Amino acid sequence: MNRLTCILFLLTILSLKATAKADWWLEAEDPASTATTNDGVTTIIAPKGATWWYKHKMSGNTIIEYEARIVADPRFKTDKGETRVSDLNCFWMADKCGGCGGKFANNYALKLYYMGYGGNWNTTTRFRRYKGYWPTEEKEWLRPVILREYTDKAHLIKADHWYSIRLEAIDGRVRYIIDGECLVDYVDPQPLTSGYFGFRTTLAHAEIRNFRYTCSDPDNDGVRLEWIGNKSHGPVTFGVPYAVGEADKQTIFSLTTNDGRQIDTDTWRLASWADGSAKWQAFSAVIPQGTDYCVLRKTDKKIGTKKGRQSIREENEEWGEIPPFYLTLNNKVMPVEKQETERQGKVSRLHKYSGRNCVMRAYTYKGSKEVKIVHTLIVDSSLNTEGLRELSIHFKVPMHGEAYKRYVAFDDRRSMSVQPLIARRKIDMQAMDSVTRSMLDNIAQWDGFRLSQLSPNGHSIRKRTYPDAPWIGTIEGQRSEGVVTVGDSVASTTFRMKDFWQSYPSSIQVDGARGDTAIVTLSLYSPEAEPYSFAHYDSIPHTLEAAYEDVQPGMSTAWGIARTSTIYVNPETTTDRQLLPTPEYLHRKRAFGIWSLPVLVSPRDSLVENAIQEIMSFYDREIERNGWYGFFNYGDVMHGYDASRDEWRYDVGGYAWDNTELASPAMFWYQFLRTADPVVWRMAEAMTRHCSEVDTYHEGPHAGLGSRHNVIHWGCGAKESRISEAWWNRFYYYLTADERVGDIMHEVANADTLLYILDPMRLAQPRNLYPCSAPARLRIGPDWMGYASNWLTEWERTGNIVCRDKLQAGMTSITSLPFGFTQGPLALGYDPATGVITTEMPEMEITNHLMPIMGGFELVNELQGAINNPAFFHMWLNYCRDYKEKAWLLRKSKFRIPRLQAYAAWHGYEKLRPAAWKSLLDNMPLAPKPSLWTNDCATWVLDAIFMQEVVNK
């Protein structure tokens, strides 16, 4: 028995050694190269280039550790006859296990991370990311860029020294650590998530030992979904991003609560990657009470119900019901012209109603009585002229039983009885004697009840006995939540108007409470308020020089704008609820490009993070302090502050409402992504609703464009894509799957065709002074950048190849311009039919600071993961590298955009890193200064969030 045990032990050892040797192969440029393993140490003799490849593919978050050294071997000499010590190199996450013949340059064809420690005869230590392109003489720029370089002696090879090396590829961040020192900390815009390891050297005697690695899937346990703000329950719809290839049409998903209860879900595709896999997937479900968080998993088969445990669908099969309703506008009934079921799932149904001035969607859910209604008012030419006097949705609610058992309750106030049992004589309801019956016949019955919020800081509650009777009552309050419950002894119905007081003037009125059917009128714009005029604030323009205003004849029109409101019937809760993936997951999947999670390691980190948070708190306070509320205002913020009056310039031309200028929506959204802060969510959501509707045209001559900042949201004559572009709305759409925002993004897909008739540079650079034979003109930024975001969004949402081709044509034609992104004049030739950009002044070079700071920079970051166009991104890198110098040289512009310098530093121009940080930290937007601008706050926050990710280490 002992002899048999010994034999088995020896066989196991031999098997392990054979397996270890079989795990590797040597790819060498010179056949004389050798690799031998003894006592756990592999010795590589490489007269020329050689790679010791590990055959097993690694996947997921990967950590590789080993020890290695270069031996001072007299067989290898320098040109001076000295012993050569060089090239302790490695590849990791390579897309192929070699196969390139051993020659170093041949590996350019692979996608991998490369560290050349002590390369070039032990004079440099360099890190590169290979992208799989073969460089040629014509395209030398395809050669992998040096992303990090050391030349000091401390970071070169010491002969015969065993180095402890650790390689990491975790959540898109790549690190190289040697003897405990991190030499590389690189965020890859296109992370390599699987691949092979290769130990590389040349003209050297190298040794490697104690090789080991671990791979893990951070999403192995599913996607954790958490509440934004307080824990809640009820119907939710949310979006989840996936990396390329992670989920396809055959993927089955399961949703469970934190305590293991299974929840039925509907799911549908929001956006796709170029290979057809899911980029964003939407989910709808009814979350049960007591749920702290949920977990979403991918499965290979349907999940059954555990024995003895009911699924949510078995507990409640009922669907919410939409009460009968009708719509009025300016006290006239607005007929529904079309009704359709837009989506039918096992958990949710979407009903769509369309009319002349409105689009309304109603969402119902199995397992919940809640109905969500999203109503959009569209201002047509008639309403623009007439003005807005009233806008309401009227619901019919059946009433039952005696009047004294009927009631109306507003917010969390005590119920108001239709017939309060208060009389001079005692009422004995149990005895129901003749005195009691007489009292009941003579006690007043109240037929109407009204809650009015005509300002953001005051509401009143009144009631009346019949339609023509006066309203009586003295109930007052400040800010109503816009909730009413109408009920009796049999049933009750509750209504809630989201953002009720913020969207004043609004009101809720109940009529017919004494009859068989009560009418509950939810007035989105209360008829009690003064009529709203869409006219411009003045009859004359005030010029760019005087008031930063660009008013033009006939352009200050509200024809085509919209306003969206949300209403709930029988809401599960009386507060908003949203379930979303964690910031860590969104960050890992690169949702919306490159951004950082909060970093608090160094004093500089604390300074930056505190400043970002203070800017968020500042706008939250300013919204409240200045009362930036109202039906057509809520969600926007002001553009510029007037220190002389100590107030915002609400009455000065282009300095008033902000209208997305310099990416103010993105400022809030990126901070929300990294923090899940419910206060920031509220500001970002409100701004998206406002800017996508009120600042944007949805019909009429300017449909697809938006209005530049002004005293009146639609007052400026500059109607441009930079305001209406899909980029601002992608955040809310992909996180919530909101169909109305989806409609808006679809509306702008072909907005560039308006360039045929509306030239954005018609005044600044008239055609007679800047020759152009193209059918239209635009600027690369912000015009083309805005259109590009529209095309990207339409392509990934619908698969529209026309939009894809326009996007690619624009990218290719920009790289063909003599000066690329700095090609002059500002107004370049453009063909909306093909997407091609041209110039007829090839010798002119010019810079434009608006190009990257109105969403263009963030768009390009996301394009890197969607479009394979290395020439375009190489030209963008050069633009970022040279912008500051060229802006001063060509235009004497000092406009700071430190994220451009940071981008260049991130991609290899390390010397620009200190300049980027100095520019950021020397210009704190809330520091004491003569003026304060939302422009400065937005650009600073976006600079900081990007820089904290890519140039922080």
Map each language-model feature to its residues.
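Short carbohydrate-recognition loop motifs
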Residues: T34-A50, S348
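Secretory/extracellular carbohydrate-interaction modules
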Residues: K48-E138
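Short tryptophan-centered beta-strand motifs in secreted/extracellular beta-sheet-rich domains
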Residues: I64-Y66, H161-A169, V174-Y176
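Beta-strand/loop-rich accessory regions of lumenal/periplasmic or secreted enzymes
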Residues: A94-G99, K103-T125, A278-K279, S284, ...
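Short, aromatic/His-centered strand-loop micro-motif at the edge of beta-sheets
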Residues: K139-S164
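Short, solvent-exposed beta-strand-to-loop segments that form ligand-recognition rims
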Residues: I178-Y196
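Catalytic cores of eukaryotic secretory-pathway lumenal/extracellular enzymes that build
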Residues: T328, P335, R343-S354, V359-R361, ...
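Terminal, non-catalytic domain-edge segments
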Residues: D576-P583, R590, W595, S606, ...
